[in-house]
């Protein structure tokens, strides 16, 4: 910063610089799934497999890839990515989107719905996607709506 600025001007310039950096970061999170994951999960450490999954999910989001099956060993974040963070990211990109979350049990599907719904209410999410709001009457974890007409519905296919 230029030393020709008085302290008040320096403070104002610094605040503007920080705001511009935040806007740039938010735009990156809106466009890049892995950047979004890092913004919502600061402790996350990306491995090679995470980058591959994120790229494939981005291709699903763009409509370039119509079907995707993720087969990996347990505890490799496939559920965190595909069933929790990806629906939240997609809802942020398109708040009028309708999402059906299907798992082998209703309990598991509703749990993902609860996590996703709670994320949409967090300040860190609202910084990236400020236009996304839950509908006022959305109380259930397994079936909720956005104020833009989007919907999330959790269903179990086994029980």
Language-model regions, residue ranges each:
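Walker A/P-loop
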Residues: 64-85
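Conserved nucleotide-state-sensing and coupling region of NTP-binding domains
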Residues: 102-153, 158
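Post-Walker A helix-loop "phosphate-sensing" segment adjacent to the P-loop in P-loop NTPases
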Residues: 89-98, 121-125
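Contiguous, well-ordered alpha-helical segments that form the cores/surfaces of helical PPI scaffolds
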Residues: 55-58, 80-92
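N-terminal accessory segments
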Residues: 1-66
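Alpha-helix boundary/capping segments in eukaryotic regulatory proteins
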Residues: 76-82, 92-98, 103
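Residue-level preference for the first positions of well-ordered beta-strands
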Residues: 67-69, 98-100, 151
């Amino acid at each position: 910063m230029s030393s020709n600025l008085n302290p008040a001007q320096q403070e104002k310039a610094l605040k503007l610089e920080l705001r511009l950096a935040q806007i740039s970061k938010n735009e990156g999170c809106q466009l890049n799934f892995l950047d979004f994951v890092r913004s919502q999960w600061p402790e996350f450490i990306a491995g090679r497999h995470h980058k591959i999954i994120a790229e494939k999910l981005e291709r699903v989001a763009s409509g370039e890839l119509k079907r995707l099956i993720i087969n990996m060993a347990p505890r490799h974040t496939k559920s965190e990515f595909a069933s929790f963070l990806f629906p939240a990211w997609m809802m942020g990109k398109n708040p009028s989107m309708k999402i059906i979350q299907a798992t082998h049990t209703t309990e598991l599907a509703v749990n993902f719905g609860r996590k996703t719904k709670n994320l949409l209410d967090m300040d860190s999410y609202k910084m990236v996607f400020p236009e996304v709001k839950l509908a006022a009457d959305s109380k259930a974890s397994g079936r909720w709506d956005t104020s833009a007409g989007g919907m999330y519905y959790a269903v179990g296919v086994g029980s």
